[in-house]
């Protein structure tokens, strides 16, 4: 209420609260960036985005560019590409390809090797732990679906 008394002073303040997608995005990106020193002294850059939030869910990597491995890798790519955002890479050594995928935040690398042609299994490499697991190609879709599920991420957060 207005007053003519000189002792009454109005302080005008504006409080702006906002949370936009850009701030959340920056927070997730900053919290996910990691540089690790490996046993051999090299530095490994990893973008540890939660698998459900990673733009590229998996990379399919033939071990070498010969012996029928690229063809088998492309077959696996065709099987997965309509359900997951995938990348195919056959350039450079397998170690360099793993590093490239780590740096862009790809949570899973599917490696097609010579044993794949014999036993119809591939190796899944997990970005965060660098551990590898041999799985049947027939089960690959279900395994990846479970690991990149937003529902499973939210369950983890709520626990």
Model-derived features: positions:
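Generic long, charged, amphipathic alpha-helical segments
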Residues: 41-100
């Amino acid at each position: 209420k207005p007053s003519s008394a000189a002792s009454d002073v109005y302080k005008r303040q504006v409080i702006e609260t906002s949370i936009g997608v850009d701030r959340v995005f920056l927070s997730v990106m900053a919290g996910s960036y990691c540089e690790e020193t490996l046993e051999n002294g090299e530095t490994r850059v990893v973008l540890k985005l939660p698998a459900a939030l990673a733009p590229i869910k998996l990379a399919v990597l033939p071990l070498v560019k010969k012996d029928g491995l690229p063809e088998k890798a492309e077959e696996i790519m065709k099987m997965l590409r309509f359900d997951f955002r995938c990348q195919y890479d056959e350039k450079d050594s397998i170690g360099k390809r793993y590093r490239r995928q780590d740096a862009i935040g790809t949570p899973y690398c599917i490696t097609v090797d010579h044993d794949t042609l014999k036993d119809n299994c591939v190796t899944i490499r997990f970005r965060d732990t660098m551990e590898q697991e041999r799985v049947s190609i027939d089960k690959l879709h279900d395994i990846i679906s479970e690991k990149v599920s937003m529902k499973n991420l939210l369950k983890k957060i709520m626990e």
